[in-house]
């Protein structure tokens, strides 16, 4: 299955280049709902809520070369508490330097202040009476270095004066997996209740792997789970959990209960994203000005993020959505998946604004800075210039 990321806004040549040569080349700073930017390397003196009922503590997590889930697991171990005691507004990239607000309950400030983990900083600790929930942010500010630009483009003076005010609102490759873009395929199998195929796709099916990992995935495909378990490394924790859980229950669906609930949800979310990206491609041919029958958000046409309670558009957009719906043989009721969650469905803008976009070309490095609303992908912005997905 492709990722359905096909079209561009800009009618220009793409100049290639390398993203994320170093973690510092990709800085992501969360923007809180009130517009406060959680800046890398700086602290904010948040006022404690008074009176405080003792429920929640919020803090800023600054991390380098950690994904959000692994960083959180490390903090859980360091504080000797449980994963369910923590929440966050949104996940962040791994090979990057990022900030994000997190919340917890059942901990003392002193426990957080004592955490010492390489490449992780806990700061801006605040007592709060409010639970931090997924989506409790405006968006993110990005500062991105693009290196190794094709030589013929380095001489163009306009690299320091690039313009972009909106992009196609694709879900980026991160939603599908940078190293192994198969998350949406696993999600489709889960939606279809084909848990055996989901298991083999996630644990087997080598793509670009080499060495022990490639051999381990080949062993999974051949049914030699014990052999695969011996070869998978620490970096394949979730594959190992799935196999061990399968040994325990001899049931492919039960195997997935070994994974964090958020990860199981992400599989189905990725399938929804795959379908949405196809809607962007189909709508591209008609333009993104509002048309009769469109469902608008901020005067921008939206597409269906298909779930069990999807509201379809009318007119041309409605026809696009129903065509994809029928092509995929969708049954909305099947988005209620026992042990995985109820995937409600919503609407999402087909294009999205890019705020405060700036470019600077210096010493053979192009630096782009901009802000995006939550749920939007910086690599879709950089792709407009480089032609690369990530």
From Swiss-Prot:
Name by which UniProt lists this protein: Probable tRNA pseudouridine synthase D
Instruction: List the catalytic residues.
Output: 93
State the family it belongs to.
Belongs to the pseudouridine synthase TruD family.
- Organism of provenance: Methanococcus vannielii (strain ATCC 35089 / DSM 1224 / JCM 13029 / OCM 148 / SB)
Q: SUPFAM superfamilies of this UniProt entry?
A: Pseudouridine synthase (SSF55120)
- Say which domain of life the source belongs to: Archaea
Give a short account of what the protein does. Answer: Could be responsible for synthesis of pseudouridine from uracil-13 in transfer RNAs.
List, for all copies, the residue spans of the domain called TRUD.
166-353
Does the entry feature the keyword Transmembrane helix, yes or no? no
Gene this chain is encoded by? truD
Record EC number: 5.4.99.27
Question: What Pfam families does the record tag this protein with?
Answer: TruD
GO MF, one annotated term = RNA binding
Q: Which HAMAP family match?
A: TruD
């Amino acid at each position: 299955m492709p990722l359905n990321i096909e079209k561009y806004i800009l009618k220009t040549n793409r100049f290639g280049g390398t993203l994320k040569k170093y973690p510092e080349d990709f800085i992501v700073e969360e923007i809180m709902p009130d517009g406060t930017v959680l800046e890398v390397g700086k602290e904010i003196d948040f006022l404690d809520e008074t009176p405080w009922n003792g429920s929640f503590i919020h803090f800023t997590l600054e991390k380098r070369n950690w994904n959000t889930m692994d960083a959180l697991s490390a903090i859980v171990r360091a504080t000797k508490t449980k994963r369910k005691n923590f929440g966050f507004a949104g996940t962040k990239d791994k090979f990057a330097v990022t900030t994000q607000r997190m919340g917890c309950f059942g901990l003392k400030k002193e426990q957080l202040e004592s955490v010492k983990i390489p490449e992780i900083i806990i700061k801006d600790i605040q007592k709060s009476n409010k639970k931090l929930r997924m989506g409790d942010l405006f968006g993110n500010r990005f500062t991105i270095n693009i290196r190794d630009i094709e030589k013929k483009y380095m001489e163009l003076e306009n690299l320091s004066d690039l313009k972009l005010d909106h992009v196609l609102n694709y879900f980026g490759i991160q939603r599908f997996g940078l190293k192994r873009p198969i998350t949406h395929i696993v999600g489709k199998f889960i939606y279809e209740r084909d848990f055996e195929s989901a298991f083999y796709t996630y644990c087997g099916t080598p793509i670009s792997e080499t060495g022990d990992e490639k051999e381990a995935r080949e062993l999974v495909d051949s049914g030699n789970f014990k052999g695969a378990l011996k070869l998978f490394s620490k970096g394949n924790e979730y594959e190992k959990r799935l196999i061990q859980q399968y040994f325990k229950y001899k049931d492919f669906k039960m195997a997935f209960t070994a994974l964090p609930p958020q990860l199981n949800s992400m599989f189905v979310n990725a399938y929804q994203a795959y379908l949405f990206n196809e809607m962007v491609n189909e709508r591209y041919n008609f333009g993104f000005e509002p048309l009769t029958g469109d469902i608008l958000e901020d005067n921008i046409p939206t597409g269906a993020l298909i779930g069990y309670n999807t509201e379809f558009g009318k007119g041309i957009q409605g026809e696009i959505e129903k065509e994809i719906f029928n092509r995929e043989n969708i049954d909305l009721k099947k988005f209620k998946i026992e042990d995985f969650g109820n995937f409600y469905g919503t609407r999402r803008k087909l294009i999205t604004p890019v705020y405060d976009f700036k470019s600077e070309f210096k010493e053979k490095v192009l630096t782009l800075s901009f802000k995006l609303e939550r749920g939007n992908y910086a690599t879709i912005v950089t792709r407009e210039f480089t032609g690369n997905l990530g």
